[in-house]
């Protein structure tokens, strides 16, 4: 088996300003070096724990499906979404397992995928790398804010529906006003894929964002194994 990161995070989980403050460093001359060390520390921690701090896309490659209805266990958590399960069929063609044919148990650690009742994993060509599971994992994803449109953009997160609960956090600055950390907000509308407005209550009006915030803004969802 093999785990390949195909779309890395666009940002580190901490802003260099927060790390600089922790190091009691007043000048910015060493920011590039600090970022380099931070990136190495993040990689080490993620590989040690098999947990992804900022959302990224992975491909998990197996030589075959588990026997019959046995589970595929996702090796990097927390799982955001399964994008696709592709396999090389016995005739050599690439096929995709329909979403309706498998179930995802995200309450289990590590998350597991099994065929739904009455279904089985398909037969594959007897060669290495015949099964490829593409998935997104991470505790949170970076957010860009359009304060004039009162919208946020979260392209690295799974598509969300109106009414879903989200939380925001920040590193190296402040959240867009009037948003606060450790506070539940609700998807008020889906402006376009990955772009949303937020409400302070379920079914409420869109929050009027009076600033875009500073530093790094992140979005996560309660229940995603400790997201913000």
Feature roles, as predicted:
Residues 135-228:
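Small/polar beta-strand repeat architecture
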């Amino acid at each position: 088996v093999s785990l390949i990161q195909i779309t890395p995070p666009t940002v580190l989980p901490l802003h260099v300003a927060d790390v600089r403050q922790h190091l009691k460093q007043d000048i910015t001359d060493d920011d590039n070096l600090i970022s380099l060390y931070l990136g190495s520390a993040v990689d080490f921690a993620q590989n040690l724990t098999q947990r992804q701090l900022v959302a990224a896309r992975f491909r998990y490659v197996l030589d075959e499906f588990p026997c019959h209805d046995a589970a595929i266990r996702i090796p990097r958590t927390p799982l955001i979404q399964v994008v696709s399960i592709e396999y090389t069929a016995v005739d050599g063609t690439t096929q995709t397992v329909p979403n309706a044919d498998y179930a995802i148990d995200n309450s289990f650690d590590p998350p597991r995928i099994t065929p739904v009742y009455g279904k089985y994993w398909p037969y594959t060509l007897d060669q290495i790398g015949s099964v490829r599971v593409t998935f997104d994992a991470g505790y949170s994803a970076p957010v860009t804010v359009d304060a004039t449109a009162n919208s946020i953009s979260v392209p690295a997160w799974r598509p969300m529906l109106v009414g879903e609960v989200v939380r925001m956090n920040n590193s190296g600055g402040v959240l867009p006003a009037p948003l606060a950390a450790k506070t539940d907000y609700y998807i008020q509308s889906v402006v376009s894929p990955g772009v949303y407005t937020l409400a302070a209550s379920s079914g409420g009006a869109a929050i009027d964002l009076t600033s875009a915030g500073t530093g790094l803004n992140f979005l996560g969802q309660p229940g995603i194994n400790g997201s913000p």
